[in-house]
Amino acid sequence: MDEKARALGTRVIHSPAPLVKKGDFIRALRAELRHGSYDVLHCHHDILSAVYLLAASGMPIQRRIVHVHNADESVPSGSRLKQRLYREPMRQVCLRMADHIVGISNYTLDAFLARRARRPERDSVHYYGVDPTPFETVSGDRVGFRRQLDLSDDALILLFGGRLVPEKNPVFAVDVLAKLRGMESHAVAIFVGSGSQERDVLQHARELGLEDCVRLLGWRNDLPEIMSCSDWFILPHPEHPVEGFGLAVVEAQLAGLRMLLSHGILDDPLLPTASFRRLPLADGPTLWAKAAVERLQQPTPSRAAAIAALHESPMDMDRALKGLLKLHT
């Protein structure tokens, strides 16, 4: 990633001190800010952006932006007491010292503001810009992809894409697969991503006798191709706190996938063309599997229609870039 950024003309600087050593980190950041004569400080570290703002205190920086990507308001401390003690003061630092508070979704912004009214010209939503090009050029070789994974040519693929961590709830997808195979015997599950629950996913699949029906692919650079060869996309995100945005949800639509979503997924990433069912996790895997079968009986979503809808949305790359540049001027 560093080399890609440098190739585009950026300068990549790694802090000589980790964030956990707060004093050393702040001193190093202040030294760089002083040396670089920066015009804009754009912080992407959610509530921890307070550390960057404090480090920049008194510096002649024209604009300070806090960009919030998650709604969990995580404070990296093993002590729950410290997390509670630090969270609100850090939020107040952001609200008082930043010129702009930007959320990647309506919920994310309002959660960070803690139900305070949005301030005109200061608090706003800026969606990710999504490039549809990779989805326009996929081959969509469904049979070839299945043979690569030693699956039957007519396998129906339930795709989970993202980190395999409790915050994404991947184990629930295995339960859904177990019920789904009772309705569609050719159903299989593919997990693209990695994380702390990789072993849990495999172990649960073994316990349910599904080991031969589950594939863990790790992180892949060809996710658009994998999506285009799948049948469903599942994201059973926990309902509290909700997903900050859900970029993979947008990508699944561009790939023409039917989607099974929990109430932990917001409306923000949904295009008008979306084919989806949103269900409570409490409904259990049987109802989720039934919803998958019902979606399968509907016409295959149009990739072209989804791409056209994206271009008319705030997630259009050109529109998102203009909005980002406006924040800096």
What positions do the PLM features span?
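Membrane-proximal helix-turn-helix segments that form the acceptor-binding/catalytic region
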Residues: R27-R30, G58, Q83-I101, A117-E121
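A short, active-site helix/loop in glycosyltransferases that binds the activated sugar's phosphate group
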Residues: L95-E136
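Short His-centered aromatic/hydrophobic patch
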Residues: C43-S49, H67-V68
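A short helix/loop element that forms part of the nucleotide-sugar donor recognition site in Leloir-type
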Residues: E136-L151
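Active-site donor-binding acidic/aromatic loop of nucleotide-activated sugar
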Residues: A189, Q197-D200, E211-R220, I226
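A conserved mid-protein helix/loop that constitutes part of the nucleotide-sugar donor-binding site
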Residues: L156-K179, S196-L202
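N-terminal strand-loop element at the rim of the active site
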Residues: M1-G23, G195-E198, L327
